[in-house]
Amino acid sequence: MTDFGRVITAMITPFTADGAIAYDVAAKLAQHLVANGSDGIVVCGTTGESPTLTWEEEFQLFQTVQQAVAGKAKIIAGTGSNSTREAIDATAKAAELGLDGALLVVPYYNKPPQEGLYAHFQAIAKAVPDFPLMLYNIPGRTGQNLLPETVIRLAEYPNIVAIKEASGSLDQASTLRAALPPTFRIYAGDDSLTLPLLAVGGYGVVSVASHLVGLRIQEMIQAFVQGDTAKATAIHCQLLPLFKALFVTTNPIPIKAALSLQGWSVGEPRLPLTSASDAVISQLKAVLDDLGLLKS
């Protein structure tokens, strides 16, 4: 059974001042994440600015992070695309490179019907039958909701082992949990819904906030799993202002700004994303300071 772990960080992609990928910083950041609560890392997902990376950059980044982590965490490649052919090729490459799995976003912009979504993921699963795959449902970005009945059909493929459920619907996650075996893992796609999702049968989170508070998120999940719901709730409430602050504008703008405030040289997002505004930076400073996450 594939286990990607409870806390998976959707890692940012650091850039140099001239906009090239800072592979050395990526390696250091990956090591830092694994030492601070991350069981797995998604490389080149939404938070990693995959739409503005070339496939060549992505493949090099996969290898950089894989080598840096050296088996201490699961490395999951963001290989989704709104072109089925491209998604198959990229996922096959990730498998060839020896990564631990792939995160496959629902095809965006072209808005396939449910049967098209089924055929898309089916084709990828058949192309890499021994490679673990995590579906990624985020209708707010893709324009299309991967419905539970489609996920249930796809889960019949043994290498489709999990879903990052970022629809924001606990009812949708509950429907999946009721219909699928516990070996099919449901991950929160929003930090603020990690604890609520656990309550309806979720397994963990693909997190942005874990760049900053991975150990606390891990502690929250473990408290819930061990039956200490009061402790889990207390941690959730303590971290909620951070969870919300990291999404006051488009991800990954706030998390990159927060990491910069902590001293990481992660650079600015690539266009069409922009730098954090003064107002966003001010809000982040206040929240980070309240949680003791800024160096004095």
Curated annotation (Swiss-Prot):
EC number: 4.3.3.7
A Gene Ontology BP annotation from the UniProt entry: diaminopimelate biosynthetic process
Catalytic activity entry: L-aspartate 4-semialdehyde + pyruvate = (2S,4S)-4-hydroxy-2,3,4,5-tetrahydrodipicolinate + H2O + H(+)
Residues at the catalytic site: 136 (proton donor/acceptor), 164 (schiff-base intermediate with substrate)
Transmembrane segments: none
Enzyme class at the top of the EC tree: lyase
Cellular compartment(s): Cytoplasm
GO molecular function terms noted in the UniProt entry: 4-hydroxy-tetrahydrodipicolinate synthase activity
Superkingdom of source: Bacteria
Pathway as given in its UniProt record: Amino-acid biosynthesis; L-lysine biosynthesis via DAP pathway; (S)-tetrahydrodipicolinate from L-aspartate: step 3/4
Name of one Pfam family that matches: DHDPS
Keywords: Amino-acid biosynthesis, Cytoplasm, Diaminopimelate biosynthesis, Lyase, Lysine biosynthesis, Schiff base
Function, in words: Catalyzes the condensation of (S)-aspartate-beta-semialdehyde [(S)-ASA] and pyruvate to 4-hydroxy-tetrahydrodipicolinate (HTPA).
Quaternary organization: Homotetramer; dimer of dimers.
Protein name listed in UniProt: 4-hydroxy-tetrahydrodipicolinate synthase
